[in-house]
Design a protein with these regions (language model features):
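Alpha-helical initiation/capping and key positions within long helical/coiled-coil segments
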Residues: 29, 72, 128, 132-135
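Alpha-helical coiled-coil heptad-repeat register
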Residues: 130-133, 137-140, 144-147
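Internal, active-site/partner-interface "lid" segment
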Residues: 146-166
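Conserved small/polar residues in nucleotide/adenosyl-binding loops
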Residues: 169-171
């Protein structure tokens, strides 16, 4: 079973933490939550090298945080030699991919970090299988469009029949 965050390497991962303060939250809530995320990261064997908080009315659909703030945090993370970015909130698959492009580093949310801690601590065969199942259920919606280059069926624009069949010669 492969963990979401591979911490078995001799070199410890270095993480930059990102939190978002929404209108419904207080700055104390966000600070406490980031402190808890830092403790979770330490438990997973990750060294925290910095953090950033953005105040938002609502999360952005593409990057969760604004693109400008993402660039600012990416610069700070690079200066701190962070190789992992930990978000305090749950990210969609598209948001994580977009952020990985901006940061140039692995982007992980709180749920993935917690699943990794469980994976590291699982001892029994049943426990390991349950953690792996939870990890796969977490990853499944995030794998959308990862292997579209392998697709042989697709409909063309304006086609009435939708997706076509694969010819027997190709099978």
């Amino acid at each position: 079973m492969k963990a979401l965050i591979e911490t078995a390497d001799k070199k410890s991962e270095r993480a930059f933490l990102v939190g978002v303060e929404l209108r419904s939250q207080t700055s104390w809530d966000v600070a406490d939550s980031l402190e808890e995320l830092a403790e979770l990261a330490t438990t997973a064997g990750v060294e925290v090298v910095g953090q950033g908080i953005q105040r938002l009315e609502a999360p952005h659909s593409g990057t969760f945080i604004g693109a400008g703030k993402a660039e600012e945090f990416a610069k700070a993370a690079k200066e701190a030699n962070a190789d992992t970015i930990l978000f305090d909130d749950e990210l969609s698959g598209a948001q994580a991919r977009n952020l990985e492009e901006i940061f140039g580093a692995k982007v992980i949310d709180r749920t993935a970090l917690i699943l990794d801690i469980f994976a590291q601590r699982a001892r029994t065969r049943e426990g390991k299988m349950q953690v792996e199942l939870a990890q796969l259920q977490y990853l499944m919606p995030r794998l959308t469009r990862y292997w579209t280059h392998l697709s042989r069926q697709r409909g063309s624009t304006g086609s009435i029949g939708g997706e076509g069949e694969i010819g027997r010669a190709h099978v």
